[in-house]
């Protein structure tokens, strides 16, 4: 011990102390230091585990599992889910009244657009008839593109508040979310929101729920989430109608990874549901999916922000992070089961989640090629809590190295792009969205093609390809009947096939059409809103692959293809798109010393053409008017020079031209 203190004093004396004057360290000192550092992490875990319990934790510990309630709010976009969540948090004292707005909409893009993108969770304590209940609320997205978020949320819930806007009634995504919740066996409580609006028709909305969903509407609650009217009636209904989760704290730990996100200080944070057993800081867990072992650094609940706890028990939903943390973001597999090391054989892994399939693809390139690694890191961090995105590296001669990204829909793509710009400061170029096609080769092979670069060339199309199929979706459209003619006209113009037409009220229509997904991603929803003055709603689900006349449309500059712009489209679209492309691209190409020919082509067939005229030098300026032969000679020489330039000269097109061309 004396040797340790002496060594410490000499080290603190700084560089004045000569190395030779240092005494020989006592034997075993280095081993002591090594054992001290290796046990430091264990000591920190022990301190975390022995932390005194807070008043909140003491209160939670006294609540048995039969007084837990896990529920979510499901509805169409903009029917008031996030506002209702705020009122419930205020009622239970989780947040101060009036001090917050959309507490569970945490992303900048959510607050800007007024939509929920990520399912967010919060724990509340509610006293009912003198007994405390632990309520766990999930605020889910309403848009069809984020259905994977909704279905994951249902896995941690026992029931749901089915919310309908009193002025708008049942909409397309209300129907979709109802069937999703019904299939999961959730207990549904009908709630009519916005009853304070002058245009509200709550009785009509209730009747729609009764006839469309065959729900018992006697227990329906009429509320105004904005003013707080009747919201206090919701929580007793939740306690009485929604069943408690099933679980046993005495069994070995069985924990489901529901979501994950990235924190710059703590690393990967995991949102989990405990089915059996309990988990504490310091426990060593193992993943069933990867087999990797981790030490738990901290456990806690969302109240509404991350609030540390000593233990998470069966039936609870909370967060954990590991210490040391996950080395790679890919280790956090959504739907994975975790248990304590040594209990692997005693625990049956949970079924997990169905992987959503990406159906809309774009290419993303950094504006500055030096920022490629920054863009890659940003994409990986956002993928942590959005596993429905697929990523492949690709390169373009025009735009350099980039990524081919797959999304569930166009809004999903747009939101991801916004998050890249806002949260990570990424400057990117995004190509227009495209959909996958299925190539059926004559030798019996099937290939899914997601990039125009992998689409068969013209010769192969004729000799080796039997058929090309494209994906179709079954679209459900709801709108007032006065717009029926315009909507049918729009669907027919987009290669749609009508399936059903029914009135669910005297003035509201539900129309079902089978549409090519390629038409749907080409701003179909924007055109639908325009045709119905904003009153239409749209929901869709995958239908089938169908044979189609699909070709690759390319942009040629002086007969050289521009790979970044190529698209796989239906043959009926090529003339419209081709003319649009050449006209738009011409506006962004600078004049050269020689003529630049811009063409849109399918294989060897040119669809449209524009020409950028060259700079003209007046070679006749110094000639006398009567010198005809000299004039002809100079003009011929200039003509020959231009022809030679066109043959050997490279067209210089700045990257900004591509950015402007690809901009919406």
Curated annotation (Swiss-Prot):
Membrane topology value: Peripheral membrane protein
Cystine pairings recorded for this chain: none
Catalytic activity: GTP + H2O = GDP + phosphate + H(+)
InterPro entries: EF-4, EFG_III/V, EFG_V-like, G_TR_CS, LepA_C_sf, LepA_CTD, LepA_IV, P-loop_NTPase
EC code: 3.6.5.-
Entry keyword set: GTP-binding, Hydrolase, Membrane, Mitochondrion, Mitochondrion inner membrane, Nucleotide-binding, Protein biosynthesis, Transit peptide
Domain tr-type G stretches: 66-246
Top-tier EC class: hydrolase
MF terms in GO: GTP binding; GTPase activity; mitochondrial ribosome binding
A Gene Ontology biological process term: positive regulation of translation
Binding site for GTP: 75-82, 139-143, 193-196
Subcellular localization: Mitochondrion inner membrane
Family affiliation: Belongs to the TRAFAC class translation factor GTPase superfamily. Classic translation factor GTPase family. LepA subfamily.
Protein name listed in UniProt: Translation factor guf1, mitochondrial
Organism: Aspergillus oryzae (strain ATCC 42149 / RIB 40)
Gene: guf1
